């Protein structure tokens, strides 16, 4: 199953990029700017959101720092980090399913993950976009908390770390991450545990609880520090935004969108059919729990309940999304289908084994599953090869424009300013501006920049009163250009940079 991933990863390590080496504009430029701050230990915010706040925390940026530095501060390091996170997540998911759920859960989980990669394309594993990076770590959290609920408290540290990473990287995963964690905790309450048909929990592994607590403290300290700082308040902004009484989606809309995101992708189902498939998945969870309860199988029983909690949280989250229910916002929900199918396979495993004893070909069922997995993985391998055989990606014209304008700004202030303040005019092409800022920083140009749009570039870019000039970046401004001493430094793709001398 991992052959396509390893093929692409090996190609990337030998110099074949999955994307242009420096997609120096837009979202990727913002990700790289924040990673550069993390390399200095100054990044306290998560990825920016189009709604004006930032996602809850910077775990993704700090995870990207080692490979970013090792690759010479190239964007390829962030792409490789995304691939590494995904490959390791797949390995952890399959390891947990195999250890606690047995061979049926392992084969079913591997088949579902292979189908997911076939749907998205193997190159998706190299996507550095934060909604994509959060998907597979959420899957690690799902199966990890299921193991904790089943009685394996040693799985708690990894489950907490994966849930925190997914929630900090993409806010949409936060409610479900909290829900599955709470479900696992509730299933350790003796009364709830008996009602759920789970065996009594063994003695608590104190080192696991201690390690999980330390991980939570370390991972969540940066966003808490930002919240408590005088110029901070991102977590309050998130809470306030989520509490706004604005337009929300109906239960029907949430069910349709959630059904498509959770299970519809498996068969390319339309919205109406996807809702029906979601009902089938919930019924399968009920069957899995009932069978596991009868056969006294703690892991599939716990996995079915934890997955159900995740589905409920996913539907509620979809109902509270502001604006259109775009697929990328809900993509993390696909891991709930992986959990549901694995729970059903694990629960039915003993029944299949007992029936197989009466068959003349007792390994037929396992063989069918492995053959199906091989077929899907073979298709993924073919897709990966087609990616590698395609033309090398080249930087876009927007990237070239950003580099040229940054070069003009750097040349214009080399002898006139030690540290200018950049002001971004309203209604400016933010994608291009981000590329300019990234290119300036990579050349070693010292500058400060005021927050603009949803972007808050702190650290060494924070204005501190030492700025000795002002650069206004925006659309052409004839009135500003006519002022005494104002000089046009450069213009590219409709973006103008004016040097305004100090008053």
Residue ranges of model-derived segments:
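Transmembrane-lumen/periplasm boundary regions of multi-pass, lipid-linked membrane glycan transferases
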Residues: 34-37, 190-199, 207-280
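Membrane-interface transmembrane helices that cradle and orient dolichyl/undecaprenyl
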Residues: 141-158, 191-195
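Extracytosolic helix-loop segments that constitute the early lumenal/periplasmic catalytic or substrate-binding loops
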Residues: 13-15, 29-54, 58-62, 66-67
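Membrane-interface alpha helices of multi-pass inner-membrane proteins
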Residues: 156-173, 177-184, 215-218
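Transmembrane-helix motifs of polytopic, lipid-linked glycan transferases
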Residues: 80-101, 140, 287-291
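Loop-to-helix entry region of an early transmembrane alpha helix in multi-pass inner-membrane enzymes
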Residues: 58, 62, 71-91, 124-130, ...
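Transmembrane-helix signature of polytopic, membrane-embedded enzymes
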Residues: 93-117
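Membrane-interface helix-loop-helix junctions at transmembrane boundaries of multi-pass membrane enzymes
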Residues: 97-106, 152, 191-207, 273-274, ...
């Amino acid at each position: 199953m991992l052959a396509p991933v390893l093929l692409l990863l090996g190609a990337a390590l030998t110099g074949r990029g999955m994307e242009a080496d420096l997609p120096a504009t837009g979202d990727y430029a913002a990700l790289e700017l924040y990673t550069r701050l993390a390399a200095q230990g100054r990044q306290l915010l998560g990825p920016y959101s189009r709604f004006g706040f930032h996602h809850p925390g910077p775990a993704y940026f700090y995870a990207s720092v080692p490979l970013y530095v090792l690759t010479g501060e190239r964007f390829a390091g962030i792409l490789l980090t995304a691939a590494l996170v995904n490959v390791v997540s797949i390995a952890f998911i399959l390891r947990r399913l195999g250890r606690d759920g047995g061979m049926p859960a392992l084969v079913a989980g591997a088949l579902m993950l292979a189908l997911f990669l076939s749907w998205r394309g193997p190159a998706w594993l190299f996507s550095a976009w934060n909604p994509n990076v959060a998907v597979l770590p959420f899957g690690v959290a799902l199966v990890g908390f299921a193991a904790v609920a089943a009685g394996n408290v040693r799985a708690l540290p990894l489950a907490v770390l994966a849930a925190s990473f997914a929630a900090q990287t993409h806010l949409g995963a936060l409610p479900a991450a909290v829900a599955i964690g709470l479900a696992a905790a509730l299933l350790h309450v003796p009364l709830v545990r008996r009602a759920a048909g789970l065996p009594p929990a063994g003695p608590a592994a104190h080192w696991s609880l201690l390690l999980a607590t330390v991980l939570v403290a370390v991972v969540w300290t940066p966003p808490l520090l930002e919240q408590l700082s005088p110029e901070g308040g991102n977590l309050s902004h998130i809470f306030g935004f989520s509490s706004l009484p604005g337009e929300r989606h109906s239960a029907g809309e949430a069910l349709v969108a959630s059904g498509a995101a959770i299970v519809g992708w498996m068969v390319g189902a339309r919205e109406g059919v996807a809702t029906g498939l979601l009902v089938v998945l919930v019924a399968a969870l009920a069957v899995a729990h009932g069978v596991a309860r009868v056969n006294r199988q703690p892991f599939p029983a716990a996995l079915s309940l934890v997955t159900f909690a995740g589905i409920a949280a996913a539907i509620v989250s979809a109902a509270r999304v502001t604006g259109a229910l775009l697929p990328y916002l809900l993509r993390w929900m696909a891991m709930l289908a992986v959990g549901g199918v694995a729970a059903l396979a694990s629960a039915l495993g003993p029944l299949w084994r007992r029936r197989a004893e009466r068959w003349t070909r007792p390994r037929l069922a396992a063989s069918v599953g492995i053959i199906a997995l091989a077929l899907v993985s073979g298709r993924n391998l073919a897709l990966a090869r087609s990616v590698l055989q395609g033309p090398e990606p080249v930087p876009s014209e927007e990237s070239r424009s950003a580099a040229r304008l940054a070069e003009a700004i750097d040349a214009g202030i080399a002898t006139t300013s030690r540290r200018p303040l950049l002001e971004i005019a309203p209604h400016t092409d933010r994608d291009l501006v981000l590329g300019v800022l990234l290119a300036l920083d990579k050349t070693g140009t010292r500058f400060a920049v005021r927050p603009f749009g949803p972007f808050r570039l702190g650290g060494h870019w924070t204005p501190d009163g030492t700025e000795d000039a002002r650069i206004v970046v925006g659309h052409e401004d004839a009135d500003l250009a006519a002022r005494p001493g104002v000089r046009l430094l450069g213009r590219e793709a409709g973006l103008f940079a004016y040097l305004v001398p100090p008053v």
